[in-house]
Amino acid sequence: MLVEAERQTPELVRASYEQTYCEMRLAGYTAVGEFHYLGVPEALAARDAASAAGIELVLLHVAYARGGLPRFRQDSVAAYLEEVEALSSAGLRVGVAPHSVRACPAEWLQEIGRYASDHALPLHVHADEQPREIEECLAEHGCRPIELLARTGCLGAHTVVVHATHADGAELDLLAAAGATICACPTTEADLGDGFLPAERVRTRGIPLCVGSDSNMRIDPLEELRELEGIARRQTGRRGVFSTGELLSFGSAQGARAIGLESWPDIAIDLDHRSLAGVESDCVAAALVAGCGADVVTG
């Protein structure tokens, strides 16, 4: 993957965005928070591809101080924030995204957190995705990742913690107190073998949830929602941990809120699709979440 990332040109990136956003729109995605690791030409390609596909795009520009590929990194947090300004000036809707506590030192997190708050921008960050990340954070900072985000001013109602797979109770309490959102990415977490979101503990604390794909391995928002409920059922030993309405909100209202949108385009469902044959009108939503794939989406 890293070798492929190194050889990407704006033209190749544009082709990838066009393919991916087309697939996403056909599957029922209408808005995307794009973790963007590259420069302005590639960002403009993302904007154009999203517009052509009918996708509302929020570009979450990634901050990388260490690790990753050289082309992902910025020389300083000031240089990173200048890139964010340039993207905004180019007409893109933007958010900030310190990649992780591994990739960004505490000083960067403080500056990015302050900038996000001052400019009312969404702040997305990977945290508690893998045990090794937690071990490294404890060794460097003496605290766990979400605790570090709180210490550096990165936790607030505008914050979205991606994954939170291994968050402990104290960290979940911090998220709840801050009004921060968790973005679960069930199919990617399964693909990488990262573990399971502590869904029941998240639910009981009232922490807002949304879902993301986090990769193009599977592009199916209904599958993400179904897998999230499946995880919760396996953890608790009971059905219906999240209601149908809650699950659909994770993929719509709460997802839009997580990327700073107040509204989002609707989708159309083929009610004559074989997956919905015989389903009464008041059960369509439940049938969508429990048993349908992206092929029921018609527009």
What positions do the PLM features span?
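Alpha-helical scaffold segments that flank or form the walls of functional sites
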Residues: 1-56, 79-89
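Divalent metal-coordination and catalytic microenvironments
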Residues: 28, 50, 96, 126, ...
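Metal-coordinating catalytic core of metallo-dependent amide/deamination hydrolases
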Residues: 41-165
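Glycine-enriched alpha-helix->loop->beta-strand junction motifs that scaffold or abut catalytic
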Residues: 54-56, 115-122, 154-157, 174-183, ...
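Catalytic beta/alpha-barrel core
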Residues: 100, 158-167, 184-190, 212
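Short acidic/histidine-rich active-site segments
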Residues: 123-130, 193-195, 200-224, 261-268
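Mid-to-C-terminal alpha-helical segments outside catalytic/metal-binding sites
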Residues: 250-267, 298-299
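C-terminal cap of metal-dependent C-N hydrolases
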Residues: 265-299
